[in-house]
Amino acid sequence: MWGFLLTVAVYIGCKKITQKRWLSKVPVILLAAGILIALILVCHTSYESYNDSACWITWILGPATVAFAWPLSQNLSVLKRNKRAVYGGLLFSCLCTIGLTYLLGRFFHAENPVIFSMLPKSVTTPAAVEISKDLGGIPELTACLVVLTGLLGGLTAHGLFKFLHIRSHAAIGVSIGATSHVLGTSKCAEKHKEKQMVLSTLALIIMALLTALAAPHVVALLEKLCN
């Protein structure tokens, strides 16, 4: 339990710190992670010990993701108007993410456990960890890659869309949800873009389901083609 309480305390503290104007651009999760790593190293505590005492956080991620369904249920009309673009785009995104990640791993001669750990990096953490386990990956590495992917998307996505003059809330929401999962979706919420948040929520849920279903089959097919 000490790991859970420490993590929550550090996160709340970092949230208040980043409200200062000169630190407003620093991602809370990145700052909190850095402080936690420093504390664990200074106290000579093993990662296993910390992880065992902070396991509640991983458990909470599941219900927290499901809670995004509330704004989705209030905006079903948005989904109905964009269903073809949403479902088609997500299927294409899922297959491309799995395929390109696998091929890049092979190109750089990465070992199978590392490649399998990378495949679900665009899926929300609870689902990504389970997918990684099923494929034979390293769950801890997967969790780190999921956070890094979400941070990168959350920090750069809206700026990139603005640069490319993409203003469609549907396109932005689906893209962010499909690639940056909960962290990207939370950025949509912070910017008070409800339509983006709704479609981003839908995208991250469907992306998790598609990746879980497609990853084993895509990997098996690519292994046959590459060997």
Positions of the model-derived regions?
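Helical membrane-embedded segments and adjacent short helical loop/helix-boundary regions
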Residues: M1-T7, Y11-S73, V78-G89, S93
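Transmembrane alpha-helices that form the ion-translocation and gating core
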Residues: G88-A128, T149-L164
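Membrane interface segments of multi-pass transport proteins and intramembrane proteases
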Residues: Q19-V26, K162-H165, K224
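Entry/N-cap segments of selected transmembrane alpha helices
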Residues: F4-L6, L76-T101, A143-L152, T201-L209
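Alpha-helical membrane segments and immediately flanking helix-loop junctions
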Residues: L72, N112-L141, L145-L148, R167-L202
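Short helix-capping/hinge motifs at transmembrane helix termini and TM-loop junctions
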Residues: C43-H44, H109-A110, G136, H165, ...
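Juxtamembrane boundary at the C-terminal end of a transmembrane helix
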Residues: R106, A214-N227
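Small-residue-rich segments of transmembrane alpha-helices in multi-pass membrane proteins
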Residues: L30-V42, G62-A67, G88-T101, L119-V129, ...
